[in-house]
Regions:
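Hydrophobic alpha-helical transmembrane segments
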Residues: 64-72, 136-137, 338-355
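Interfacial segments of multi-pass membrane proteins
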Residues: 214, 220-233, 318-343, 401-414
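Hydrophobic, glycine- and aromatic-enriched re-entrant/interface helices and adjoining loop segments
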Residues: 114-122, 235-344, 368-369
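Loop-to-helix entry and N-terminal half of a specific, functionally important transmembrane alpha helix
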Residues: 360-400, 406
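Alpha-helical transmembrane segments of multi-pass membrane proteins
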Residues: 34, 99-102, 146, 205, ...
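Alpha-helical transmembrane segments of polytopic integral membrane proteins
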Residues: 36-42, 141, 145, 352-355, ...
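Hydrophobic alpha-helical segments of polytopic membrane proteins
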Residues: 69, 89-96, 172, 189-206, ...
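Membrane-helix boundary/helix-loop-helix interface segments in multi-pass membrane proteins
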Residues: 2-27, 40-41, 45-207, 389-403, ...
Length: 460
């Protein structure tokens, strides 16, 4: 009895401390829900991990990853917005460096690239797998938030005829070299700082994953849109991007698929017919190759069908034995199979709540970079969740996008914890300012009431 009371007391203490955090409580509750769902789902969906590890070992590993993720989130939560802004401007350089190492396929002993499913997307750093594309997504969203806000700040400074404190390199080059004087124009600064980095990153990602490059490109364009980039410039940049992809496609065709192989992978996935009747008449290697191609997406659809309204309940999934990585790319199908359509709808509501709440946080903030960062990160989290769901319900080709904070995967989990940490930090700052404004308003109101009361006494 005493032990139970102590445990209840500890839980209440932990809950009270969490509720005393100054960040947005709704986002905090969403994070807790997603982490709890991930524990439940990963424990139940991992009977056949590639390493053949036990469920207990898997849960220990996931528990350690969750601990690291919460630590990352906690550290970023205490960051000032100006610190996050200062780090964000290096997002493109960091992404460029990581992707360059992938393209060169380095092998330096302690760190080397790793090929998975015919594509190079990861590093092995002293045995730890690092998914570069996950890092690039968040880095580039934060970078674009900085770049657009910096361009706007520079433009405002020039209008007010004062020295700009942002984009110092572009301004210095424009002042020093006559042939680079075009860099004084806001349009060219957007080209150099916003459009070119986005196009370069997406092009470099094509070698590792064409579908990921397209998805990241879409997220970056959407981030630019919510940042207020002129739609005409976005249209031109989009046309340039399409022209670049067309040029790469031409290289793929001219080389008979020997170069830019990932383009062929994207096209093949978009054109795959997941009908099991395609196995008829096939034998040997062709039969097994086609079976492997069809098994996962077909089993994912079967899982959704068998889930029906209320699902099979925890631990009763059967399709997890058919889909080897259901804990990653097909986590939503697994959740629907075990918890039914209602469970699937709850997952949708949770991710939509992230977007809705982030809109409120963005409006609360008076810092331009903070508004863009919250909007872009929320768009990334929700967009990836819905891309994952679309693939699971057969509304799109396989992309390898995981379900944020639920699917198994260390790199993705830590990166999205960092994204949520930034959102919480910005919400904390915005809430502090609102609270200060409310206190000032209340103080002014009290002062007015005191003055009125004093005036009435004098009249009496």
């Amino acid at each position: 009895m005493e032990n139970t009371e102590r445990q209840d007391s500890r839980l209440k203490t932990i809950w009270n401390r969490m509720m005393n955090l100054k960040g947005d409580k709704v986002i905090l509750i969403i994070i807790i829900l997603l982490i709890l769902i991930s524990f439940l789902a990963i424990f139940s969906s991992t009977p056949l991990l590639p390493s053949q590890s036990s469920r207990l070992a898997t849960m220990k590993e996931h528990g350690f990853i969750v601990f690291l993720g919460i630590a990352v989130m906690f550290v970023l939560y205490h960051f000032e917005v100006k610190w996050i802004r200062g780090l964000s401007k290096w997002g493109f350089i960091a992404s460029l460096g990581l992707l360059s190492l992938l393209v060169k396929e380095i092998d330096w002993g302690f760190i080397k690239t790793e090929e998975i499913n015919g594509a190079i997307r990861n590093f092995k750093l002293m045995g730890l797998q690092i998914h570069v594309f996950e890092v690039v997504k968040v880095s580039m969203v934060l970078y674009l938030s900085w770049a657009v806000s910096a361009v706007n700040e520079d433009m405002q400074a020039r209008k007010e005829r004062r020295r700009s404190r942002t984009l110092t390199i572009a301004n210095w080059l424009a002042d020093r070299y006559t042939f680079l004087s075009f860099l004084r124009l806001t349009k060219w600064k957007r080209i150099v700082y916003v459009y070119l980095p986005s196009i370069i990153v997406c092009m470099m990602m094509l070698k590792g994953s064409g579908s990921s490059a397209i998805f990241v490109g879409f997220i970056l364009v959407a981030t630019m849109f919510i940042c207020g980039v002129p739609w005409k410039e976005l249209a031109v940049a989009g046309m340039i991007g399409i022209a670049g992809f067309a040029a790469l496609f031409a290289v793929y065709k001219v080389s008979d698929g020997k170069k830019m192989e990932r383009i062929g992978t994207v096209l093949s996935r978009m054109g795959v017919d997941y009908d099991m009747n395609r196995l008829e008449g096939l034998e040997g290697y062709e039969f097994h190759n086609m079976l492997d191609t069809l098994r996962q997406p077909v089993s994912a659809k079967v899982a959704i069908y068998e889930g029906r309204l209320l699902g099979k309940h925890t631990g009763n999934s059967t399709q997890k034995y058919q889909v080897s990585n259901i804990y990653g790319d097909y986590m939503y199908s697994f959740l629907v199979e075990e918890y039914g359509l209602l469970g699937g709808i709850i997952i949708l509501i949770i991710y939509l709540s992230v977007l809705a709440r982030s809109v409120i946080i963005s409006r609360m903030s008076d810092d331009e970079f903070a508004r863009y960062a919250v909007g872009g990160l929320a768009l990334l989290i929700t967009g990836q969740a819905f891309m994952h769901i679309a693939v699971n319900v057969d509304l799109g080709p396989m992309t390898g996008q995981t379900l944020p904070l639920i699917s198994h995967g260390a790199s993705a989990f830590l990166v999205f914890c960092a994204a949520f940490g930034v959102i919480l930090s910005i919400s904390r700052k915005a809430k502090n300012k609102i609270q200060s404004a409310e206190e000032m308003t209340q103080a002014s109101k009290n002062n007015i009431e005191e003055n009125l009361a004093a005036a009435e006494k004098i009249e009496d």
